Amino acid sequence: MTDLKASSLRALKLMDLTTLNDDDTDEKVIALCHQAKTPVGNTAAICIYPRFIPIARKTLKEQGTPEIRIATVTNFPHGNDDIEIALAETRAAIAYGADEVDVVFPYRALMAGDEQVGFDLVKACKEACAAANVLLKVIIETGELKDEALIRKASEISIKAGADFIKTSTGKVAVNATPESARIMMEVIRDMGVEKTVGFKPAGGVRTAEDAQKYLAIADELFGADWADARHYRFGASSLLASLLKALGHGDGKSASSY
């Protein structure tokens, strides 16, 4: 197996196959569930808006892949600093049956100098998730933070407040995941000594098998080749799947989505 094939197979099994569009429908989510079951294995999860969780759960079960996890988003995509609303949305997502919640960190508040509200928001959402055995990923929106010190600080605050994963981006701003921001965030995980318990998720802009290979190489360099499993690493993407399948000899690499 070539290096690209090997990394593509790894990446496919680490995907949170995503649709977070304003025009999402039951039909589109059902199609996403079907795509998550591929000829070479399943994606780790799908990521959808909360209202679609019941139909996704039913579809995944009916197609014989109940183990594919369902992730959803809260405080999304704006990252406002209203803890009460973020917590209510997170509780609602859990009630819908989410296995994982990707909450947006109040990054604008941090940029304005407020470190406390981010900690408190993540901590409140973590407590709700932990009580229901739901994984919490925290989106810090690196493309808006821009500054390395801010990216580092948002990562540290999220981890201290209990994040199970730190995630680069919503996919809804001009700049999403970059290898540079990925390295900074994974270095924080390493420097805080939390690589056993905290994972990393680049999202938005990871579109090709070659892109995925680059991101996995950074993880391998920092943590060794065995670290990036589904408990420690995810790719938030949709168009990536077609490219990975093409690299693995399935399909033409064309995708209907840009995430």
From Swiss-Prot:
<feature type="active site" description="Schiff-base intermediate with acetaldehyde">
    <location>
        <position position="167"/>
    </location>
</feature>
<feature type="active site" description="Proton donor/acceptor">
    <location>
        <position position="102"/>
    </location>
</feature>
<keyword id="KW-0456">Lyase</keyword>
<dbReference type="InterPro" id="IPR023649">
    <property type="entry name" value="DeoC_typeII"/>
</dbReference>
<dbReference type="GO" id="GO:0016052">
    <property type="term" value="P:carbohydrate catabolic process"/>
</dbReference>
<dbReference type="InterPro" id="IPR013785">
    <property type="entry name" value="Aldolase_TIM"/>
</dbReference>
<comment type="pathway">
    <text>Carbohydrate degradation; 2-deoxy-D-ribose 1-phosphate degradation; D-glyceraldehyde 3-phosphate and acetaldehyde from 2-deoxy-alpha-D-ribose 1-phosphate: step 2/2.</text>
</comment>
<dbReference type="InterPro" id="IPR011343">
    <property type="entry name" value="DeoC"/>
</dbReference>
<dbReference type="GO" id="GO:0005737">
    <property type="term" value="C:cytoplasm"/>
</dbReference>
<dbReference type="GO" id="GO:0006018">
    <property type="term" value="P:2-deoxyribose 1-phosphate catabolic process"/>
</dbReference>
<keyword id="KW-0963">Cytoplasm</keyword>
<dbReference type="Pfam" id="PF01791">
    <property type="entry name" value="DeoC"/>
</dbReference>
<dbReference type="InterPro" id="IPR002915">
    <property type="entry name" value="DeoC/FbaB/LacD_aldolase"/>
</dbReference>
<comment type="similarity">
    <text>Belongs to the DeoC/FbaB aldolase family. DeoC type 2 subfamily.</text>
</comment>
<dbReference type="GO" id="GO:0004139">
    <property type="term" value="F:deoxyribose-phosphate aldolase activity"/>
</dbReference>
<keyword id="KW-0704">Schiff base</keyword>
<dbReference type="GO" id="GO:0009264">
    <property type="term" value="P:deoxyribonucleotide catabolic process"/>
</dbReference>
<comment type="function">
    <text>Catalyzes a reversible aldol reaction between acetaldehyde and D-glyceraldehyde 3-phosphate to generate 2-deoxy-D-ribose 5-phosphate.</text>
</comment>
<protein>
    <recommendedName>
        <fullName>Deoxyribose-phosphate aldolase</fullName>
        <ecNumber>4.1.2.4</ecNumber>
    </recommendedName>
</protein>
<feature type="active site" description="Proton donor/acceptor">
    <location>
        <position position="201"/>
    </location>
</feature>
